[in-house]
UniProtKB/Swiss-Prot annotation:
This protein's GO CC annotations: centriolar satellite; cytoplasm; cytosol; endocytic vesicle membrane; glutamatergic synapse; nucleolus; nucleoplasm; nucleus
Residue ranges of the region described as Interaction with PYHIN1 and necessary for interaction with RFFL and RNF34: 150-230
Short sequence motif named Nuclear export signal, residue ranges: 190-202
UniProt-recorded name of the protein: E3 ubiquitin-protein ligase Mdm2
Length: 491
């Protein structure tokens, strides 16, 4: 595993997931530049295990704060000793193959003789598989811990094989669950690097803000003399499917998706809280705000209040500021004025007709019988005025007409007929276009208000409404008993 000559096979598939746990404990000696970097964060030895190197490297990145604040898996080392060591301005802890190569360029295996023999281990192991040599038990054990289709880059040395055989003999009586957990321990160095380095950089930053790092199982300040392998073993035992990720595969496996998802989840949990941009629109208290968005209403349609000079939308009748009624909001009622003008015109026409013709010099002819002519003219004026007054007063009966009837009953009948004629004349004199016709007769206008209680309904003429009252009929609209009928006049 610690062979610096990492030659990739011709088929392109490279993996280290089959390396036993004892290979991870192989002692390595950092080169002077890497050793200087490790000692700057508290390292005191000359030889280290791979896990110790990764731990100190993560401590260095965290101490120098070389990581990106937002994307904490990215490390910037352009102006740092780490950049001189790796020869790159920046890298990501997710680039396992690249980091794996850069680290091992600066490491020297303690036992060079044993590591030099690992270059021919591929052919030797194939011979052992075909010939059935004395190490058949070891091969079977290795076949259980690795995929049959994967190709090896380097094999462990002879001493590591012996240690693996002794470990398998000691653990032969353990349960299958312990054997499965042992296979998790024998995962790739690159996986340990990713978790040791990435979690040192990312997780310990979160430790300063919360105590959520307890669930990760990675110690923040481990005892390097006695507790490195123990803590790393506990961390490997706690992880499950996410440990199956192997960086040496050209094509990512299905397990790698689980690992990447869990890693991204860890990063998201360590970042600051997500901030969402929300736009809040304050609604107005009135309905006039909708006119501003109406494209059919322009500023020319707005009206100006005479009290406070406020510009208001065209539809509301009151000012939005002072609540003053809009000037000329409704047309003036000119019905009365028209009636007065027509009456005055009639009177003038009648007086002009009664006075006769004028001479060109606008003077009347003087006659000897001027008094008699004046009396006759006055009599004519009186008679014509009385006739016009009778027509304007809806043809009221003259007082002299009652003398014609001898009996009192005849007088009552005449008065009843006169009142009916008066009502009919009033109904006929009203303009039909001003009000709707009676619902019952469809001929006369609606001027008979049917009153019941404090309310009334105007839906029939006065004659039809009186007939309903005489026949004790209810109101046709609300079916309430009719109390009275009121004759309604319209201007």
């Amino acid at each position: 595993m610690c062979n610096t000559n990492m030659s990739v096979p011709t088929d392109g598939a490279v993996t280290t997931s089959q390396i036993p746990a004892s290979e991870q404990e192989t002692l390595v000696r950092p080169k002077p530049l890497l050793l200087k970097l490790l000692k700057s964060v508290g390292a005191q030895k000359d030889t280290y295990t791979m896990k110790e190197v990764l731990f100190y490297l993560g401590q260095y990145i965290m101490t120098k704060r070389l990581y990106d604040e937002k994307q904490q898996h990215i490390v910037y080392c352009s102006n740092d000793l780490l950049g001189d060591l790796f020869g790159v301005p920046s890298f990501s802890v997710k680039e396992h193959r690249k980091i794996y190569t850069m680290i091992y360029r600066n490491l020297v295996v303690v036992n060079q003789q044993e590591s030099s023999d690992s270059g021919t281990s591929v052919s030797e192991n194939r011979c052992h598989l075909e010939g059935g040599s004395d190490q058949k038990d070891l091969v079977q054990e290795l076949q259980e811990e690795k995929p049959s289709s994967s190709h090896l880059v380097s094999r462990p040395s002879t001493s590591s094989r012996r240690r693996a055989i002794s470990e398998t003999e000691e653990n032969s009586d353990e349960l299958s669950g312990e054997r499965q957990r042992k296979r998790h321990k024998s995962d790739s160095i690159s996986l340990s690097f990713d978790e040791s380095l990435a979690l040192c950089v990312i997780r310990e930053i979160c430790c300063e803000r919360s105590s959520s790092s307890e669930s990760t199982g990675t110690p923040s300040n481990p005892d390097l003399d006695a507790g490195v392998s123990e803590h790393s073993g506990d961390w490997l035992d706690q992880d499950s499917v996410s440990d199956q990720f192997s960086v040496e595969f050209e094509v990512e496996s299905l397990d790698s998706e689980d690992y990447s998802l869990s890693e991204e989840g860890q990063e998201l949990s360590d970042e600051d809280d997500e901030v969402y941009q929300v736009t809040v629109y304050q609604a107005g208290e009135s309905d006039t705000d909708s006119f501003e968005e109406d494209p059919e209403i322009s500023l020319a349609d707005y009206w100006k209040c005479t009290s406070c000079n406020e510009m208001n939308p065209p539809l509301p009748s009151h000012c939005n500021r002072c609540w003053a009624l809009r000037e000329n909001w409704l047309p003036e009622d000119k019905g009365k004025d028209k009636g007065e003008i027509s009456e005055k015109a009639k009177l003038e026409n009648s007086t002009q007709a009664e006075e006769g013709f004028d001479v060109p010099d606008c003077k009347k002819t003087i006659v000897n019988d001027s008094r008699e002519s004046c009396v006759e003219e006055n009599d004519d004026k009186i008679t014509q005025a009385s006739q016009s007054q009778e027509s304007e007063d809806y043809s009221q009966p003259s007082t002299s007409s009652s003398i014609i009837y001898s009996s009192q009953e005849d007088v009552k009948e005449f008065e009843r007929e006169e009142t009916q004629d008066k009502e009919e004349s009033v109904e006929s004199s009203l303009p039909l276009n001003a009000i709707e016709p009676c619902v019952i007769c469809q001929g006369r206008p609606k001027n008979g208000c049917i009153v019941h209680g404090k309310t009334g309904h105007l839906m029939a003429c006065f004659t039809c409404a009186k007939k309903l009252k005489k026949r004790n009929k209810p109101c046709p609209v609300c079916r309430q008993p009719i109390q009275m009928i009121v004759l309604t006049y319209f201007p």
